[in-house]
Swiss-Prot record:
This is Uncharacterized protein TP_0665. It comes from Treponema pallidum (strain Nichols). Residues 207-251 are annotated as: Disordered. It comes from the Bacteria.
Length: 251
């Protein structure tokens, strides 16, 4: 299988290195997929800077047999470096946008049935990063806006580990009253991710319809249950977690 890293961003590459302890291997072919990092104990690390749903097919192949750590960065401080067509710098500024934990609810929709698997852990990494744009009139939009050519990691601030839907819901549930509406949800800091957060809670039985206040729907907060039993397709058949790995480049 051909390993293609020509489109890999600096951010993705830096996070792979950050989560590669001594003895790890990168870009390892395993079960028909290329894994970002494989630790000495066999744990697989997958770094996904956006679009977590794109990991669905790969995770379905790997989770029955391997421990998998999914790393998702949230940029709490973002800087923009704008370049002219000739490569000279036009400006460098701080973006007003700030990432937050709550954006994860938008990302995990397609992974819903995998989140309680005993072999999966989700690591949200809070970072400072830089995006590099060039104004060369080659952007995809009809207005030929500046295009992103790279993203870079500046600093890792902290990280959080989540191992099931209950742990993912807890930061949100802890801020909500027993009976709440969408306005209460928005005040927790979810912002533009409010409807995704509510969908997550309702889909997992952690928010149930209660009543109405005028035309406003009210919901009751429910404690998360234990949903650790994997679906039938995730049960391994005669194979353990260990499997011989194909050779990968030493890093």
């Amino acid at each position: 299988m051909t390993i293609n890293t020509c489109r890999e961003t600096g951010l993705h590459r830096a996070l792979k290195d950050y989560f590669s302890p001594r003895g790890s291997r990168q870009e390892v072919e395993l079960r028909g997929s290329i894994c970002d990092v494989v630790h000495p104990d066999g744990t697989i690390v997958e770094v996904q800077t956006s679009g977590l749903g794109r990991l669905e097919a790969k995770l379905k192949k790997l989770l029955p047999y391997h421990q998998v750590m999914v790393v998702y960065p949230v940029s709490r401080r973002l800087y923009i470096r704008m370049l002219n067509e000739d490569g000279s710098e036009r400006h460098y500024r701080k973006s007003p946008k700030e990432g937050s934990f709550f954006q994860i609810y938008r990302e995990i929709g397609r992974l819903h049935d995998l989140l309680d698997h005993e072999h999966l852990s989700l690591h949200i990494v809070y970072i400072h990063s830089e995006v590099i744009k060039v104004d060369d009139r080659k952007g995809r939009s009809r207005y030929k806006k500046p295009r992103i050519v790279d993203r870079k990691l500046l600093e890792v601030q902290s990280s959080e580990e989540f191992r099931n839907k209950g742990s993912l819901a807890q930061p949100l549930l802890s801020k909500l009253p027993e009976i709440f509406c969408c306005d209460d949800l928005a005040q927790t800091g979810t912002g533009v991710h409010c409807r995704y957060a509510l969908r997550f809670l309702r889909r997992n039985g952690m928010a149930t319809p209660h009543s109405k206040r005028g035309r406003t729907k009210l919901y009751r907060k429910e404690p998360p249950g234990d949903n650790r039993s994997p679906p039938p397709w995730q049960e391994p058949h005669g194979e353990g977690l260990a499997e011989k790995l194909s050779p990968g480049p030493a890093r």
